[in-house]
Amino acid sequence: MSQDGASSQAAESQRAVAKSRSQVLRKMWARKPSQAPALAQSPVMSWPLILVSLLGGLASLLAWNGRTQPDDWASLWVGGLLMDRGLESHLYDADPIDFTAMSGEVWPRLAQEVSAPFTHPFVQNPLFAKALGAISHVMSFETSVAWLLFLSGMAVVVLVAASYHLWFRSTMPWGIAALVTACVFALPTTLNSFWIGQTTPLIVAGVAYGLAASRTRHWLAGILLGIVASIKLTPYALIAVMLFFAYRRRAALWSLATTAVLAVWMFIRVDMSVISDWIDRIGDIGSSVLVGGANQSLASTLATDLGKPDLLVTVVRDYPSHVKTIPLCIALGVVLMVTAVAWLNPVYRFEFLITGAWLIAATFSSILWTHYMLMLVTSVFGLAAMARTRLTRQWPYIGIALLVVLLTFPVTNPIAATPYTGGFMYSGITAMLLTLALMLVVGGCHAFAVHRYGDGDAGEVGAGLGSELAAAETLKFPQPEPMVLFDLRKR
């Protein structure tokens, strides 16, 4: 009797455990998207990461101050001087053939007031020149370069931490952030940004932080993205994608509101003739093909023979139709492939779509400078995040290694090469296209492994006793975000 009682108790215990397991699994699978736990409650920048960013800014300042040739920053600074001194009618004076040369006498005269030897015409929003004109009252050009170096060093840390947070949905450990930042500092794309005084680290870090924080800090992420979009037009493509996601829509609306406020402020503070000149300048760049080794866009590589060998970048207005249609057709095809992979990969749907949109907008634009490659940091973290299934366990890291080798190859290094070096103009577009291909393949394999084998982001789900609990543990990891259109099939 005692043995029968013990066996019956054991059977009841097993039934209770099985029932509890089934109830847990049923509740977790039945959870609605709106009831899913927040994916990004942890801060993008913790206090240790903020300290690391300050140290990164200090390191870049000590390493580069007085050792740069900030031609690009000088162009922005001269634009600010023109606005401040009532010479805004000359803000967009540019040579019709040489993209890097100014026209007239006003630009060269003011360019002599800065220490950079090669300034180029202003192409940004005139409101940006207005802001720089105000800054010129409180600091000299040399002081502004020092501040740019410090802020750029901080921005690299923010870029690394925000890219990690976007894909891994947790705060990046500060020690790993410091190590990765040191590696990013050594990349030629970063060296190029610091050397010529580019604002790209600030722009890219602003975009990455805005995307990572768009779920929890709607107003901050939205305002930041709105400001960046007013300076560089590419983020508008990202804002459009964010509107389709319920948890990101509020940040997108904040972005649109910010750009609207800045647009109204521009029409109030800037003469219509200057705004018209800016619109004409942007339209001229978009309708032309900028050919030269410095511009590594696909259109530039297709029209290499049309450029003047003595010019760094030639503005070509008469070109074969295939120079524009081939990049457009490839871009449309990549858009369809990115959308298809995102459809099949709900866990990383937002991250995949937003990173894909960012890559596509930059890869197939009219201009692709070397310092634009800094945005690939976000994609590298995406490849690492999706490398946690049996089909994507090791070889994505081989792809990352190939990408790093490509970006650090001497022909792409601004210290070891120039835009006139053979092969230089192909390095950027090759890196961008390689990254897009890696994202599509890794994303597709990740989706297939999850659907076919049940692999989760915690690793492969074990078989046998306890496999249900292992699956339940996998569900504790980030859940798919609800999205308009993609989720209609589930309703």
Go through the PLM ranges and name each one.
Residues 60-61, 226, 383, 441:
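Hydrophobic alpha-helical segments of integral membrane proteins
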Residues 382-491:
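Aromatic-enriched
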Residues 45, 184, 236, 375, ...:
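Hydrophobic alpha-helical transmembrane segments of integral membrane proteins
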Residues 2-5, 13-220, 247-370, 452-457, ...:
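Primarily membrane-embedded glycan-assembly and transfer machineries that use lipid-linked glycans
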Residues 151-154, 198-206, 231-236, 256, ...:
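Membrane-embedded alpha-helical segments of multi-pass membrane proteins
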Residues 369-386:
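Hydrophobic/aromatic-rich transmembrane helices and adjacent perimembrane loops
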Residues 219-233, 237-243, 357-364:
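Membrane-interface alpha helices of multi-pass inner-membrane proteins
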